[in-house]
């Protein structure tokens, strides 16, 4: 089968995409690792913000941060390491940064997207979709996807509620970049 130069380049670029991880604790029990691939080829600023918040190499980030809002059959939202309740957070670029583009879609389980409070208000809050959420396309910047640990996301989802309040704390006990 012939593969064009463009297709080869695309495959090579995708192999070089950064991968980051969260080790998840629910209540007092370690529940496993989520591995996420970041689309630095399409949304480099958004992907770099998330990567740097996973590594903590700017002196702040997701370590010990909670998922403050979990709605089954919708999403798990976290990333407010400032206030922990969904009202705070900051990016590596300062407080907020602009929507980079909306090329990637909320096409199903495991999609990683930026939470915001309107256009161009990205900080550190993000969510992991647990279903297709196409009504969010064009409003929230998708920047990656879960590539391993889907079962851990399902465990997180199971302690959520319709209101988003979690039955037990869901915490990122460790995080970083896989190299």
Curated annotation (Swiss-Prot):
- This chain's source organism reads Schistosoma japonicum
Its principal location?
cytoplasm
EC number assigned by the record: 5.2.1.8
Listed GO cellular component terms? Answer: mitochondrion
- Note whether Isomerase occurs among the keywords: yes
- Enzyme category, top tier: isomerase
Pfam families, per the entry: Pro_isomerase
Function recorded in the entry: PPIases accelerate the folding of proteins. It catalyzes the cis-trans isomerization of proline imidic peptide bonds in oligopeptides.
Query: Which InterPro entries would you find in this protein's record?
Result: Cyclophilin-like_dom_sf (IPR029000), Cyclophilin-type_PPIase (IPR024936), Cyclophilin-type_PPIase_CS (IPR020892), Cyclophilin-type_PPIase_dom (IPR002130)
Q: Which domain of life is it from?
A: Eukaryota
Question: Any idea where this protein resides?
Answer: Cytoplasm
- Membrane found in the keyword field: no
The protein in question is named Peptidyl-prolyl cis-trans isomerase E
